[in-house]
């Protein structure tokens, strides 16, 4: 049984804070260690360009976010961890998807609609300050997901639309050019941890109420001391309901620790003492990671090497897959022309190659006809590049390649002529 492929994007537009850690980094790192899961994590620096026009900020954010995830335990050997802009196949796929995505679909995108509604409400031109990047943002996100045929994409409920739009793009492309993409599914956690900030509102850079994830001990203690509390004196019972301090503590503490602080609230613990308890609990978890983070942040060359290695791993899949997609849409070598006929013929459903990874870690592919019937099945390859090269040989040389690759193929499910006809159909598109 093949593994389930998860994909997570991280926009490089700010410095990670405790809310990011509790809501995304910590659960994602834990999930990446699950057996039978193939995880892709990417730094979405192309996406950041839509929000940020400060080059230094994007570069610094990329460094800080990469260092934060690595310090929190993300294993680049176990997962594929890469920078979006290091995989040129992604913007190329964006264009292919742009050509099958209706403008009406993009008109309904939440970010674009919100910008238009805001302008309309203030009497401005609906598209004032709306860039093509903002409008096309869902297509780029679709390319991120579909390039690696992710099965599951963890998102909040407010981001489900992005996955639905990626599914639409996949289905549109598959309808026109054959089955190439797996329509992704949104993975929604029943309860995503959301931390309150210093002022009690959701911890967010927008409210400037965050606690940086790897603030120094001194800064962490100072920021925690600034958490807004009520005026109840020491000895007066205090409510845990609505207490930002208690909610933050709960996100880090065990059930027993939480119960102990709840009892202390009931007994009238002083706010200063409660803040000290919170500081010590957070620092106990963060301190080991802080040391690792500082080591990484002061060695950007090490992070760069990790990201480039991750990009190379990602491109082992992306490059041969993109070659298949280019061929599918007609971006082919003229020497591969299968017919001189100039008459327009009706579009027919084509056979297709499907490449995937099994639980044993090996990469395989199969050739199916337009109805999904299995025609050809490979044995396992050590890398997706090797599998992609075999597919390319079959597409180029047809049945001749079947002889050359016979030691890497399962016994045929059908006769050789049927497979040969399918390969010729795939090569010519007719």
Predicted features and spans:
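Conserved nucleotide- and phosphate/pyrophosphate-binding catalytic cores
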Residues: 161, 170-360, 370, 374, ...
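Short, structured motif recognition centered on aromatic/hydrophobic residues
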Residues: 362-367, 394
